[in-house]
Amino acid sequence: MNFAEAADGVELAWTSEGEGEPMLLIAGQATSMDGWGPTAELLSRYYRVIRFDHRGIGHSGRGDAERYTTRRLANDAAAVLSAAGAESAHVYGHSMGGRIGQWLAIDEPQRVRTLILAATSGGRMPDSAAEPDSAAEPDKAALDALVSGDLARLEPLFFDSEWARNNLEATHTFFNSRASAWAKARHFRASREHDAWSELGAITAPTLILHGTEDRLTPLPNALLLRGHIARSVLVRVPGAGHGLHLDHPGTVEWIRQFIARRSG
């Protein structure tokens, strides 16, 4: 394990495996780098995979509350890239990690070769003057389950039941990152307050949007909105997938490989 130093001096734990073009994995809220589990292993067969713990999570330091915004967390991601000796990378963000990836692509476009956004959104609805698109909002039961932390309620929102039964270790690791209640609350707030709609047009990196058709935490209309706001984007709908499609649908790895190969050729 290695440590990068963030702008405010906080140490950020990171690791890498594999060889080839660098790929930075950005986890969702309150999820450690270990939560990428089998997906990181699959990707490391083709890329140099760089993973890290967000501030307040796992082996990383905490820092001040004011640093917990998706835009500032993108600065942390950039610090990890620098520490890893990667001037640029393919950036793959899941959920809040996708929100962080958006800011990295907006603020430091030279560092993002391609952008992969899984189960994420641009934040609050783009037209505040209009009625919000209720179809894009998480349903109340799903949001209540997320806040509760009850694994029995959370697991079906993320994973196919058969996959979860056959991947007990990966499921356990994903839901059991080391994090204080203080850090979890800051991550939740950062994710919920994310709003990048007005700046998504600045993203120049080729972008692959992966989204499950049954995602109740970040419903599919969010992906359609992202597709409309990011010029060089492609949307792949994953039939039957929930919020954890980055793990329980390993076929997404091949789609990512094909997407990167076409953009790099």
Give the positions of each predicted feature:
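Conserved alpha/beta-hydrolase "acid-adjacent" motif
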Residues: 216-222
